[in-house]
Amino acid sequence: MLVRSIHLTTRRYVTCLILAAMGISSLSGCSRQFWRKQADKDTYNNIGQKLNDTRWELPRIDLIPDGRSRFFDPYDPDKEPLPPDDPAAHVFMHSVNGRRGYKSWHKLGASFAIENPNWLENYGIDMNGMDPVAGHSEVKLLKVTLPELVDLSYIHSRDYQTNLEDLYISALALTQQRYNLGVRYLGVNGSEPFVDGTATTLGNGRANGFSTAAFGVSQLLPSGGQIAVELANAVTWNFGQGGSISAPLLGYSVTQPLMFRAGRKVVLEPLTQAERDVLYNARSMARFRQTLFVGVSTSYLNLLLQRQLILNQLNNIRQLEEQYEKQKALDSRIPGFVTEKLENFPQLRQLIPDDLKARFTYDDLWLKWDGPMSEEDEQRLLSLSDSDFYRAAIQQLIGWKNQDVTSLASYQLLTQLQNAQATLATQRRVLADSQDSLKRDLGLPPNVQLDINENGLAPFEIISWDLIELERRMREIQKNLGKQLLPDLGENQADTPPDFATLRAYVDGLVELRNDLREKGINVVMNDLKPIEDLLNTTQDDWKASRPDQRFFRSEEERNLLVQNYQKDKATFERAERDFMFGSDQLDMLLRLIDVETQDDILKTLDSDSNGMIESSELPQAWSDLPRLGTKTAADTYTLDAFLSEVRDGSRILRDDYLLRLAQQLEVLQAGLRVEAIAINRFTLPESQEFPEIEQVVEIGLENRLDLMNNRAQVMDARRRMEIAANSLESTLNLTFQGSQGLSGGNRILDSNQTARLEFTTPLDQIDERNAYRASLITYQRQRRSYMQSEDTISLNIRQNWRQLQVQEYRLEIDRRAVRTAALQYDNASLLATAVVQQGAVNITLALNTLLNAQNTLAQDWVTYETNRLNIFVNMGIMQLDPRGVWDDPFYLQMNDLQDDGTVSPAMTPGVVLPNSQPQN
C-alpha cells in the first residue's frame, strides 16, 4: 500500500507539473499584434516630438502606404500569406537535404501577387483574382498635371516609402535607448522573471520536488550606477512524507562604476545619439520631400521640352515638304524656250517650213525653239535634213524640250527633309524613354500609359497651329482646283477660258479661306498685340514695374527695344489689315459677279445692252482695281470667255498675294509678338522684387539647409565619440553593494547576508581600445573636413545656380531676337525660292535650320532657367511645400488652379481614364 501511495503521489505531482507547464506556456508572451502596435505607438510618439519646427514638418509619418498604392499590403501584417515564390527555390521549403521541411507553411494561405492585388481597381480595371501585372498596360493616365504627378509619387514612390521607413527605424531604436534607462524587469543578476521546477524519483520509491521562482526590477542611473531588487522563493516537496519547505528571499544590488563606463557623458551617449538620429532623419525626410518635388518637376519640364522639340521638328518637316513640293513643281515645268548649238549650217534657213518659222529659228550658231512641241513637230524637224550633225543637234534640242529635270535645289531639300525625319524618329524615341523613366521614378510600371498635360507649352506656340493649317489649306486649294483652271506647264498657251463650275468652286473656296483668315489670322494677331501693349503701359513710368505674370525687363534699354519692335509690328499689322480688306472686297466683288447658276447667266446679268459683250461700264467700279498679270489693265469690253479668264487670273493673284502671302506675313508677325510676350518666373526672394545678391542667397542656404544642419550636428557626434573612446582607456573601478534577507517567519536578523565589493582592472591590455581611440580622433577630423566640404559644395551649387539664372535671363533676351530674325530670314528665303533661276536651295535650308535652332534654343533656355530656379530654392533650403508636396510658388500652384491661400489635401487622385472611355479631345 505504501508503494502504491507513493506512485499515486508521484503521478499526481507529475500531472501537476504538466499542468503547470501548460499554464506557464500560456504566459509565453503577448501576441505579435500587441508588440507591433506598442512599437508603433512609442515610435510615432518619438517622431512627433521631433517635428517641432516648421522647416521639417511632415504631413505623414504613418508607415502604412496609401490604399491606392501599388505596394500597399491589404493583408494582416502579423499573419501574412505566403507570397509567390520561385518554383525551383520553393522545393527546399518542403524538403531540404533529404529531410522533410516544415509542413504548415501554407496554413495562412498564399497570395497570387507580390504587389497590391487591388491597386488597379482605382483605374477601373478588375483583374478578377489574377496577377495585376497583366493589367498594367490597360492603365491610362492622360493629361496629367505636375501637381498630379507629385500626388502619384507620394502614392507609389518606393524611395519615399523607404525614407519614411528609415525615419521609423531610427525612432524605433530610440525606444530601446529610452527603455534601457527606465525601470526594467531584470533581477540582481540581470535575469528576467522566471519559474523553474524539478521532480525527482528516488531509487527506494521515494520522490521529491524542487521549484524556484524569482521576480526583480532594476534601473540604470544616468551616472552609470545600477540598482536592482529581486524577490525569490525556493520550495522543496517531500512527496513520501507529504511535507514541503519554503525559503523566500529578498535580494538587492547597487553597483556604481567610478572610472570606466562612469558618468553621464558615457551612460547617456547612446540615448543622446538616438535622439539626435531621429531628428536627423526627420530633417532628411523633409529634405527628401523637397528634392522629390524638384526631381518630378525637372522630369516634367524636360518632357515638355522634348515634346516642344518634336513639335518644332514637325513644323520644320512641314516647311521642308512645302518647299520641296514647290521646287518639284518648278522642276516639272516644260521649258518654253530651248536652244542647241549648231555651227555653219546656213542652208537650214531655207528648209524651215513657213508654219514652223514662228517657233523654230536658226542664226547660224543656235537652233531655237519657242513654245510647245508635239510628236508631229519632232518628226518634221528630224525630216528637214539628213545631215548627221543636224540630226544630232535636233535630237538634243528635242531632248531639252522633253527632259525630266531634277534640280540641285530639289536634291538639297530632299536630303534636308530626310535628315529631319530621322531626327524626329530619334526625338520620339527619347521622349518615350523619358516617359518610361518618369513612370519608374514615380513607382509605376513602365507600360502604364501616361501622358502629361501640355498646357505648359502654350507660351512656345509662337505660330498658331490654326494659322499653319490655314496656310496648308490655301496651298491645297491651288493644288486641287487652281491647276484645273490653268495647268501650270510653263508654256505660252492660248488664253483658254476656265471651266465655270471649277472657277465658281475656286472662288467659293477662297471666300471661305478669307473668312477663316479673318478669324484665325487677323483677329488672333490683333489679340497678340494686346499683351505687349499692356506690358508697355504697365512699365511706362517705371521699367521695373511689370506684374508677376508679365515679362520683366533687365534694363531700360531692353524696354526701349521692345517699344521700337512693337511700333514696327503694329505698323506691319495695320498694313496687313489694309491689304486684307482690299483683297476681301475684291473677292466679294468676284463672288457677286459669278454668283449665277451657269456661265450664260453672267451675260444675262451683266450685259445690260444685250450686245453679247461685257463693257467696263457694266462692271463694278472696283473691277478696275482687280489685280492682273504683268502690266495688264482693265479692258473696255470683254467677251464672256475673256471675262472668265480675267476672273480666274484675278482670283489666283488674290490667293497668292492677299491670302497666302498675307497668312505668311501674319505668321512672321505673330512669331515676333508671341516671343516678346513669353514670361519667365523671375528669381526673387519673398517680399522682394529685385534679383538678390549672390552672397545673400549663399548666406540663406548655409542657414536653412537641413542636411547641412545634420552635418554640423554630426561633427559634434564625432567629438562626443572621442570622449567615449577615451573613457574605454581608463581602469575599471566598480563599487558594488549586495545583500539578501530571508522572509520566512522563523528567520532572524542573522539570516541576512550583506556584501561590499570593490572591483579594479588594470589598463594594461588596451591595444584595441587604444586603436579605437586613435581612430576616433581621425574620424573627428574627417567629420570636420566633411562638414567644410558640404558647406563649400552648397555654396558652390548656389553660386552656380545664381550665375546660370543670370546667364539664362540674358540668353532668353537673345533668343527673342533670334526667333524674330530667323522668322524674317525664312520669309525672305521662301520668296526667293520661288524664283525660276536659283543657285540651289542653300538659302532656304539655311533659313529653315536657323528658325528651327532658334525655336529649340528658346525652349531649352526657358526650361534651363526654370530648372535652375528650382535648384537654387532647394539648394537654399527655403522651398516650402504644401501637404501634397507641391511648392507653394504661384507658378506651380496655378497648374492646378490653386492660389497661395488655397487649401489642399495630400495625395489627391490624378485624373483617371477608364479603359473603355471615349477618346479624348
Which residues make up each language-model segment?
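Amphipathic alpha-helical coiled-coil segments
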Residues: 163, 167-174, 288-313, 323, ...
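Hydrophobic core
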Residues: 18-26
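Acidic, low-complexity, intrinsically disordered peripheral segments
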Residues: 33, 37-74, 78-79, 345-387, ...
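Hydrophobic, small-residue-rich alpha-helical packing segments that form membrane-like cores
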Residues: 171-174, 179, 185-188, 192, ...
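Small/polar-residue-enriched beta-strand and adjacent coil segments characteristic
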Residues: 33, 132-136, 140-152, 156-160, ...
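Regulatory alphaC helix of protein kinase catalytic domains
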Residues: 67-152, 691-694
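N-terminal secretory signal peptides that target proteins for export/translocation
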Residues: 1-11
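N-terminal Sec signal peptide cleavage junction
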Residues: 29-31
